[in-house]
């Protein structure tokens, strides 16, 4: 585990002078005298897949022995490109710089490409940015939530996922999750004859079709089938547990309005991604269609994409994804805006967000008055082996770590046991088709 503080004394923990080759490779404005200051000496990326999904982990190292920071830059669809951005573009600009200057370094990297933004650059930037916050916490001897203002709550409520073919099966799973302590449960319903998002395949043949994304989608079948099932689930489980549902941006604006109207009686905690980012202009009409709380944002790659929706008060939950938004530096500002406009946060946290990314989420969750609910991934034993300190919910809540920084470490040796799949598939979200053969949003 990295040291939690640094000293200016001559002890073994004192920052060492940077090697000449580091200074030679450092950018034009990096200070030449590093003997008394903490400096970045290396930026390294690691690819690992302990759960099958590729993680991109960034480690920012310093001239203080044992002091480093970790960041999550994971986007399973653009893994190699993100690694290249960090290694080939960002790392050379960071050598020799002070890791404490997080705001300045974020602006430096963000503006370095001239054509700014986009998922690849933002995820790469997030890996560096979160690692710098991790270093800052270790130097200060404080956990992330304390750096962000301190605890606003004892623990962060989490939601888990269940799915099934019918209301009886799903309701039984919801009640079982409630017995385990979860007060919020996302429910996904299999639609016969379609490749339904968020549901388990029924057999090996369907699993193979899903792997190849060779299935088809039928929005009208979804609209006929899902609302009655959601209403029946609510009748079966009562009002003691909150229900969530994800439409996963597969509907047109008019279909989304119909869905909002039809699920009113299911009394959802929120309806997620009823509209794709490209259709965000239709949120006013969606809001007018009913009183169902609306959640959106996991696909947004710029915090400014949220601002018009917050200003018009047409969304209730911001589904922030820290890696895709460029890290904690911009996301903490978004969280403040969410609070000011009376909405709540519901950070994205499925299996494609590493334990490092989940720890970043929890820093925001525990410190923000605007927090609503945290999506909870199930991190299996191989993942916990690679990431000592992996956040794990207890009775449906994340209590967070009081260790300095993120509170999560990375075992490089263990990570090598779980290489990313080869060859990597980058087209799986583009292979779903409508009945007429046209490409369907994922």
Swiss-Prot record:
Keywords (A to Z) from UniProt: Magnesium, Metal-binding
A Pfam family the protein falls into: MR_MLE_C
Family statement drawn from the similarity comment of this UniProt entry: Belongs to the mandelate racemase/muconate lactonizing enzyme family. GalD subfamily.
Protein's recorded name: D-galactonate dehydratase family member SSBG_02010
Species this protein is from: Streptomyces sp. (strain SPB074)
Function comment: Has no detectable activity with D-mannonate and with a panel of 70 other acid sugars (in vitro), in spite of the conservation of the residues that are expected to be important for catalytic activity and cofactor binding. May have evolved a divergent function.
PROSITE patterns linked to this entry: MR_MLE_1
Listed InterPro entries: DgoD-like, Enolase-like_C_sf, Enolase-like_N, Enolase_C-like, Mandel_Rmase/mucon_lact_enz_CS, Mandelate_racemase_C, Mandelate_racemase_N_dom
UniProt GO MF annotations: magnesium ion binding
Organism lineage: Bacteria, Bacillati, Actinomycetota, Actinomycetes, Kitasatosporales
SMART domains: MR_MLE (SM00922)
Transmembrane stretches, start-end: none
Residue positions binding Mg(2+): 246, 272, 298
């Amino acid at each position: 585990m990295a040291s939690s503080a640094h000293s200016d004394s001559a002890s073994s923990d004192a920052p060492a002078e940077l090697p000449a080759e580091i200074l030679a490779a450092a950018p034009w404005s990096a200070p030449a005298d590093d003997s008394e200051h903490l400096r970045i000496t290396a930026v390294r990326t690691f690819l690992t897949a302990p759960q099958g999904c590729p993680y991109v982990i960034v480690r920012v190292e310093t001239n203080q022995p044992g002091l480093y920071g970790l960041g999550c830059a994971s986007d399973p669809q653009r893994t190699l490109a993100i690694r290249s951005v960090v290694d080939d573009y960002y790392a050379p600009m960071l050598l020799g710089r002070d890791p404490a200057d997080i705001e300045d370094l974020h602006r430096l990297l963000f503006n370095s490409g001239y054509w700014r933004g986009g998922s690849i650059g933002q995820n790469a930037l997030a890996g560096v940015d979160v690692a710098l916050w991790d270093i800052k916490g270790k130097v200060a001897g404080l956990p992330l939530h304390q750096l962000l203002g301190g605890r606003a709550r004892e623990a962060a409520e989490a939601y888990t996922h269940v799915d099934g073919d019918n209301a009886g099966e799903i309701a039984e799973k919801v009640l079982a999750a409630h017995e385990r302590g979860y007060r919020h449960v996302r429910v996904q319903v299999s639609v016969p004859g379609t490749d339904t998002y968020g549901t388990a395949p029924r057999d090996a043949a369907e699993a193979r079709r899903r792997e190849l994304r060779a299935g088809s989608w039928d929005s009208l079948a979804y609209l006929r089938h899902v609302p009655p099932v959601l209403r029946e689930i609510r009748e079966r489980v009562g009002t003691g547990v909150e229900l969530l549902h994800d439409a996963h941006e597969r509907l047109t604006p008019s279909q989304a309005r119909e869905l909002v109207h039809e699920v009113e009686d299911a009394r959802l905690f929120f309806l997620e991604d009823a509209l794709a980012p490209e259709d965000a202009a239709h949120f006013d009409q969606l809001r007018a269609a009913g009183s169902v709380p609306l959640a959106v944002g996991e696909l947004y790659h710029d915090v400014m994409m949220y601002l018009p929706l917050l200003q018009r008060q047409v969304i209730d939950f911001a589904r922030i994804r820290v890696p895709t938004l460029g890290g904690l530096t911009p996301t903490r500002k978004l969280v403040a805006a969410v609070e000011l406009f009376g909405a709540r946060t519901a950070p994205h946290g499925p299996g494609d967000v590493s334990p490092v990314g989940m720890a970043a989420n929890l820093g925001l969750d525990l410190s923000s008055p605007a927090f609503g609910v945290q999506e909870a991934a199930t991190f299996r034993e191989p993942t916990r082996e690679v990431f000592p300190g992996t956040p794990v919910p207890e009775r449906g809540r994340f209590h967070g770590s009081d260790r300095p920084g993120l509170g999560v470490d990375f075992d490089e040796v263990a990570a090598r046991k779980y290489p990313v799949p080869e060859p990597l598939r980058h087209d799986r979200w583009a292979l779903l088709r409508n009945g007429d053969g046209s490409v369907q949003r994922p």
